[in-house]
Regions:
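A structural signal for well-ordered alpha-helical scaffolds and beta->alpha junctions
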Residues: 3, 41, 95, 111, ...
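Active-site catalytic loop in hydrolytic enzyme cores
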Residues: 65-136
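Short, surface-exposed linear segments at secondary-structure transitions and domain or protein termini
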Residues: 87-95, 209-218
């Protein structure tokens, strides 16, 4: 299973945080993935994985919330953040309709997230979900690192897809903080890392195209 593979990977690699991309594999949108998600959470709790490695998970629907939800889970905190920027017709309705959890549409959050940041090893981390990163934060305290959980796969137009991911990552860095590193984690490979001095880590990008787990050094 993915969890067992992840445990094996973590036993061989020293990491500070485990981050999942935005995905539809885990969540509560239907009974099948809900059961898979419950099993994942149960195993994490049994192994107390969150005490060894803080986790930034992503769920397609979370418990009663009909939206994409990022969950930061550490020994000290469990912080939820909903996806704020939903695309009309594709992810949400046009007129603010409310949909049930099992719908193929999501619900627009009624208010902005209170928690967009968390601190790990004295580093203030800005966690964003996909297109949320394209819109500037009103916070006056800049993050030391931005992590974006993304799934651009529906924009995959063949040979130009690489540029789509790259341009989205660059625009996000302009938006969130031009002076700190940014990691844009893609669900089907193509993870982009941009350093504080704007260098692209193409080694990480290439590895992410075929490796299920990768270590990113900042």
């Amino acid at each position: 299973t993915l969890y067992n593979d992840l445990k094996l990977f973590l036993s061989k690699n020293n990491v500070d945080i485990v981050v999942f991309s935005e995905n539809v594999y885990y969540g509560y949108k239907n009974h099948y993935i809900a059961e898979r998600t419950r099993q994942l959470i149960k195993k994490i709790e049994q192994d107390k994985l969150f005490t060894k490695h803080p986790l930034l998970l992503s769920f397609y629907g979370y418990e009663y919330i009909n939206n994409v939800v990022a969950v930061y889970w550490s020994q000290q905190d469990m912080i939820l953040r909903q996806k704020e920027i939903l695309i009309p017709f594709f992810e949400k309705g046009v007129f603010g309709e409310e949909y049930s959890l099992i719908s193929d549409r999501l619900n627009q959050p009624k208010s902005k997230n209170k928690h967009g940041y968390f601190t790990m090893n004295n580093i203030r981390i800005n966690a964003r979900i996909c297109y949320d990163a394209l819109f500037p934060s009103i916070s006056k305290t800049y993050p030391g690192l931005t992590i974006i959980q993304s799934d651009y796969s529906w924009l995959n137009n063949g040979s130009a897809y690489k540029n789509t991911i790259l341009n989205g990552s660059i625009l996000s860095k302009f938006s969130v903080n031009i002076h700190s590193p940014l990691i844009n984690i893609q669900n089907y490979g193509g993870t982009i890392v941009i350093s504080d001095d704007w260098k692209i880590n193409w080694d990480v990008y290439n590895k992410s195209l075929y490796m299920p787990f990768i270590v990113i050094e900042i």
